Amino acid sequence: MGAWGITVRQSDDGLDLLDTIVAEQLRNVNFTVFNVSEAITLLNQTIQEEIEQYKQKPPSKITDFYISKTLMHDFINAALLVAECLYDYYQTGELVVYDYIGENYDPVEYHIKNFIVTKADLQPLLAELENVQTPDHWKYQGWASEEILKQWLLHIQSVYQTLKEHL
């Protein structure tokens, strides 16, 4: 798992999901505020729309697999991504994101120092952080080695604890 790290923010899926937040939410507010509830809703709607598009295709094992494994897993990755964004904000006082612009997709760095988050936003994120720590969860089982699994668990537990402190 992961394009180059253990966090969802470092995975291909996480980067795609974060790009959706950048393009659809953060650009609209000139990168001044990250609204957790809006980000969760946006990601869930985007994933659901993609599922609906795939359901319009002729049934096949590949389509069924893509919907049941890849797209359904994106709901979990979306929750973990938003939790990691909050974690970064709580740890550093800001969230650093990149917007890729122009023909060459040149990265422009933004520092978001304002978050809108409620206790109601935190509950489902904490539940998902707890769920993925279960040994029979696909996310838990997906690591290549015991060492990487331990690093990931420490990360998830740290995110969980930090968010729980803000409940």
What are these regions (language model features)?
Residues 24, 89-92, 166:
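Residue-level signature of the C-terminal ends
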Residues 27-70:
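Short amphipathic alpha-helical segments and their helix-coil junctions
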Residues 74-140:
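Amphipathic protein-protein interaction modules
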Residues 7-10, 32, 71-75:
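Helix-start/N-cap signature of alpha-helical segments
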Residues 1-26:
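Short, extreme N-terminal segment that most often corresponds to the first beta-strand
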Residues 11, 41-50, 75, 139, ...:
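Gly-Asp-aromatic-enriched flexible segments
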